Amino acid sequence: MSKQNHFLVINGKNCCVFRDENIAKVLPPVLGLEFVFGLLGNGLALWIFCFHLKSWKSSRIFLFNLAVADFLLIICLPFLTDNYVQNWDWRFGSIPCRVMLFMLAMNRQGSIIFLTVVAVDRYFRVVHPHHFLNKISNRTAAIISCFLWGITIGLTVHLLYTDMMTRNGDANLCSSFSICYTFRWHDAMFLLEFFLPLGIILFCSGRIIWSLRQRQMDRHVKIKRAINFIMVVAIVFVICFLPSVAVRIRIFWLLYKHNVRNCDIYSSVDLAFFTTLSFTYMNSMLDPVVYYFSSPSFPNFFSTCINRCLRRKTLGEPDNNRSTSVELTGDPSTIRSIPGALMTDPSEPGSPPYLASTSR
């Protein structure tokens, strides 16, 4: 290892490394919000999956794996936040550094893969409702999920057996995205995990919208909302991942043109990359919205909870007001009755035709 200004040799590769104080000021609050909301959303989703789903279906199995990937990514954010707060001085040793980088990469990739699978599953159920893929068993869906996890782990496991911590002056650098004069497997996967799923998600979303409009189903208010939701999912995916990918491509172009002879030219793009990289974690924070709209079990669960709260409140009112009502009127029949809708749980499932088709 050698050091000259921002120049650093990492594992035999010439790299440019920066410790920008702006990262320590700006990113920790952003990651903190992503952690809090992501933990609440995905934690609640996993709780519903594990304890409140009456039955499992293939589409729900894919959603469950998406929630697992998002949750595992979210719980790594406090360690990444501490790394930023310490201005790129990792305090927990080499093995925890590898584990954190592996978990971030694996679960970011896993989240993207299962989000893509959910889009493909929805595509077949809406556009090709009689396709044999719509009839796969829960066992087959579980096997597919395990296979996808195996691929994800295989593509990112190199982070576990490679020493990712490097001494940088008086600090320990822990990062998998240093600016180095080489095109690594990690960089290739970072680009591929965006462009390939993006193409699939855009194709599936476009075909779903076109199919619904061909059947003239898009005139229904609930179907319009479903179409809007499909578009929002695609837009959020682009907003979360495109900025960091675009900046990374810019870095590759600068490396091609200038090598690492002058590290100063990379200062601004390095700051831009790690800033936009924090947007990718926002996708895991927003995925609970996908669970809510993709399966009627989630809105039904929340409706049941709200109804139970209202029922308890309404049941308490007659007890509190009963003596007063009798005293004033002399007739207990004047006491208000509880609406029947609050006395019964909502039926399963009460969703619009399009959304219901995604969970059958």
Swiss-Prot record:
Stretches in topological domain Extracellular: 1-30, 82-98, 162-189, 248-270
A GO CC term assigned to this protein in UniProt: plasma membrane
Gene3D superfamilies: Rhodopsin 7-helix transmembrane proteins
Source organism per UniProt: Rattus norvegicus
Pfam family, one: 7tm_1
UniProt-annotated location(s): Cell membrane
Tissues and organs where the protein is expressed, per its UniProt entry: Expressed in adipose tissue, lung and spleen.
Transmembrane segments: 31-51, 61-81, 99-119, 141-161, 190-210, 227-247, 271-291
CDD domains according to UniProt: 7tmA_HCAR1-3
Membrane topology per record: Multi-pass membrane protein
Protein task: Acts as a high affinity receptor for both nicotinic acid (also known as niacin) and (D)-beta-hydroxybutyrate and mediates increased adiponectin secretion and decreased lipolysis through G(i)-protein-mediated inhibition of adenylyl cyclase. This pharmacological effect requires nicotinic acid doses that are much higher than those provided by a normal diet. Mediates nicotinic acid-induced apoptosis in mature neutrophils.
Comp. bias (Polar residues): 321-336
GO molecular function, one term: nicotinic acid receptor activity
Protein name as it appears in the record: Hydroxycarboxylic acid receptor 2
Disulfide bonds: C97-C174
Modified residue annotations for Phosphoserine: S325
Domain of life: Eukaryota
Residues on Cytoplasmic side: 52-60, 120-140, 211-226, 292-360
Family note: Belongs to the G-protein coupled receptor 1 family.
Disordered, as annotated region: 320-360
Example GO biological process: positive regulation of neutrophil apoptotic process
Keywords: Apoptosis, Cell membrane, Disulfide bond, G-protein coupled receptor, Membrane, Phosphoprotein, Receptor, Transducer, Transmembrane, Transmembrane helix
